[in-house]
Amino acid sequence: MGKIIGIDLGTTNSCVAVMDGDKPRVIENAEGARTTPSIIAYTDKETLVGQPAKRQAITNPKNTLFAIKRLIGRRFTDAEVQRDIEIMPFEISKADNGDAWVTVKGDKLAPPQISAEILKKMKKTAEDFLGEPVTEAVITVPAYFNDAQRQATKDAGRIAGLDVKRIINEPTAAALAYGLDSKKENQTIAVYDLGGGTFDISIIEIDNFDGEQTFEVRATNGDTHLGGEDFDNRVINYLVEEFKKQGVDLRNDPMAMQRVKEAAEKAKIELSSAQETEVNLPYITADATGPKHLNIKVTRAKLESLVEDLVNRSLEPLKTALADAGLSVGDINDVILVGGQTRMPLVQKKVADFFGKTRKDVNPDEAVMAIGAAVQGGVLSGSVTDVLLLDVTPLSLGIETMGGVMTTLIEKNTTIPTKKSQVFSTAEDNQSAVTIHVLQGERKRAADNKSLGQFNLEGINPAPRGMPQIEVTFDIDANGIINVSAKDKNTGKEQQIKIQASSGLSDAEVEQMVRDAEANAEADKKFEELVQVCNQADGIAHATRKQITEAGDALNADDKAKIEAAISELETAAKGEDKAEIEAKIEALIKASEPLMLAAQAKAQGGEQPQQSQKDDGVVDAEFEEVKDNK
């Protein structure tokens, strides 16, 4: 069985880890970093992911996508999406199914399709390290992700060529990583996870017995649209409004806004360790009076005043999670802070004040989620046997009943996997069919909750209202993904639905995206092969010219003209994109260069160099032979 990798698919950064023996190991990417920016850029020739995409963001703002996790599994009409439309430099558009998608160069792309590019990068990073294909993964998601968002994350994995064996909640993954370093007495921990785009709080009990650890999530809560991006946006707005006093609104200039975004993020980070910083962006824009420069001083106090309400927003879920777990602040042994935004002193102070104790950092480089996911991968593959994980469903599940009320079947914070049934009946006499409308949320009114889908159970025998017995069963798997069935106990007729969420991608759409991804992989491979053969052509042309110079008069004029013509034809071919033609021109140059080799040998034999040196000087021979080997 191959390795199951652990992937932290983050809003701002992503990371991959794997069990290396009995220890999880974070794998460095091709750029040598443990984390990869969750940024994707589409250029005319290729798709860039990670640091290469980030480097060109200023000059390509409309086609450089970031924070896509904030859109995954969301409807275009969601209030959070509408807010993002106002601030994102790229175009967020409405898909035919009502989802929030992104339009790039005239093409509509689904968030799972875009996220798959990051997952493919993580997959290749792991494959390069392991030296073998990787097909299975555990992927982290915010604990407060609903069913649509979880399903969309699984779709992203599938598009990337991964069988997602488990979706694991981020705070739970952090607890697993924490537990590895803390095999001591039983304890209850609070995991406060404020990342780039989402916030979660989980209350987790860790029981240690006879060398085995049980991680039981008691309660979870959060906000799937609260994170570092929101903090950045407050700083961006402040800088733009301050600069507006010069009479120029930078919001009309996408390239300028991208520079401001980078500077705002940098300033926010610097203010975690400094009391003040200066944002200096020369030549940010220009008007009729000439170039304009942005130079604004930002203090830590100013930053805190801009974002204090966001930090306070994170405290309400803490109270709810503790209440749901039936615990008080005094019952918490340790507070674990994870996510890049928790480096902010104001966040640390507010959390410390709330719990009455200082926090503990698990891993400052944010690789902690991937480590936990890798441990779960080890559990699933059988390489880790002393860990048991008991997670929960973050939101209540139920159906719409008479009067537009949501009747809950499975309460939030129920340990998963779980299954529950309840008997309902008809609302009218002789009703022959019922519609089962599946909901997720905490509101009493059905319309105020998230609709996950609906289906009909037909063929009910005529009977007075209230007489037929319709058994509705909810079945939640370990990924938190839901199956719902309805059965007429009188006739035995049954109908069921695997909730894909009414805002999700259909199987056909996912399959098409898988095929597109495979096609792109083939195109990427061809592009890489073309670059390699062009480099070979350039090297051979350069080496051959050098040999012509060294041969001097030993090479006759006709042979020299033929070789130079072959070089010219090769260089012309190398400017195109026909790999076969370039290879043919390489072969033609090799053939045309045979007299050059003879001339070089004759000249060498006429000199004072020993035979061994003649062999060593056969540079062209070695290069020609190498090209043949590569074909």
Curated annotation (Swiss-Prot):
Calcium keyword on record: no
Alphabetical list of PROSITE patterns matching this protein: HSP70_1 (PS00297), HSP70_2 (PS00329), HSP70_3 (PS01036)
InterPro entries per the UniProt record, alphabetical: ATPase_NBD (IPR043129), Chaperone_DnaK (IPR012725), Heat_shock_70_CS (IPR018181), HSP70_C_sf (IPR029048), HSP70_peptide-bd_sf (IPR029047), Hsp_70_fam (IPR013126)
Annotated keywords: ATP-binding, Chaperone, Nucleotide-binding, Phosphoprotein, Stress response
Positions of region (Disordered): 601-631
One Pfam family from the record: HSP70
Phosphothreonine, modified sites: 198
Family affiliation: Belongs to the heat shock protein 70 family.
Function: Acts as a chaperone.
Name of the featured protein: Chaperone protein DnaK
Species name: Mannheimia haemolytica
